Amino acid sequence: LNAAALHRQVGDREEVDCLLARLEAFAFLHFITQTGDAAASALLQQVEELAARVGRQTVFFALEWNRLDPARAEHLLGQPERERYRHYLRALRQFAPHQLSSAEEELLQELRPVGRSAWNLLFDKLFGHLRFGVDGRTEEEVLSDLHHPDRAVRRRGADELTAGLRENLHLLTHIFNTLAAEKMIDDRLRRYPSWIRARNLANELEDRTVETLVAAVTARNDIAHRYYARKQQLLGVDELFDYDRYAPVPGGEEGQVTWDQCREIVLSAFAAFSPEMAAIAERFFVERWIHAPVLPGKRGGAFAHPCVPEAHPYILVNYTGNLRDVATLAHELGHGVHQQL
């Protein structure tokens, strides 16, 4: 293996990965807004099966690269023409102690469509179908009640959410336990020293960095305690319950925020920080890169979904018009701007 051959192989892999990433992004986003649609679900499954086949046929590259003698690998990485892929190749070698045999890695790639992704798909389908309360509301519509100034409305929303989840507790618990068990088995087979090591490697973080952060946050739990004690006083309640956590503080702004008002609030805030950031964020509105309405079958929550460097990201929110939704959109747009850059 010489430097030129390595460059060609990584370039070919990049081309395949980018094409596959586009297909996966389209299939996932097409499905996630209509989880009950059979055709959308079938398309996502087909793309995941294709990704598994491609993964099985290309997994050899990472395995062989990681088996290369360290001195030889560093020599190849030191070539000036390798600069484009140097970081990618160095990051791959961090996983060398945890890779399995070629046959085992190929088998795991083959099983991908019926492993973690299948359970995640089942979870998304389940939540896309869940309805809460006598009015049959969606998850996002019920969660919106938790931000209502009327405590009775918040309590009703919490009760409806709990009741709806309890009816599906057996299935949700099974999904959660299965995913946890798969993670445990994978960590054991790959000889990770702790449950978080694989994630830290993927994030290119040292364990001690994450442990320091966790310790620092845990050591100041008193900040959260003081916050909720003060909120209890401001709300004037004898005891603070879970459905009071997001209650608006008396005297603050209330009422519905239209989509146009939301857009103005978010872009104005971004512009005060960086006009360039606001200009990029505005493209998400103008070019319709945001999916905002609450729809039956649409997944709850919010996210910014990247694609490839040559394609723009997308944002999903479930906009119900409260201040929480405005903050959520601003948060996701921050990710979106980052991904676009």
Q: What positions do the PLM features span?
A:
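Glycine-rich, acidic/polar active-site loops that bind/position phosphate-bearing ligands
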Residues: 166, 174, 211-218, 259, ...
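Active-site recognition of the HExxH zinc-binding catalytic motif
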Residues: 191, 320-341
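Short alpha-helical functional segments enriched in proximate histidine and acidic residues
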Residues: 220, 224-227, 269, 336, ...
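Long, K/E/R/D-enriched contiguous segments that form extended
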Residues: 230, 234-278, 282, 304, ...
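Catalytic zinc-binding patch centered on the HExxH motif and its immediate surroundings
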Residues: 252-257, 290-311
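Short pre-active-site segment immediately N-terminal to the catalytic Zn-binding motif
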Residues: 253-259, 308-330
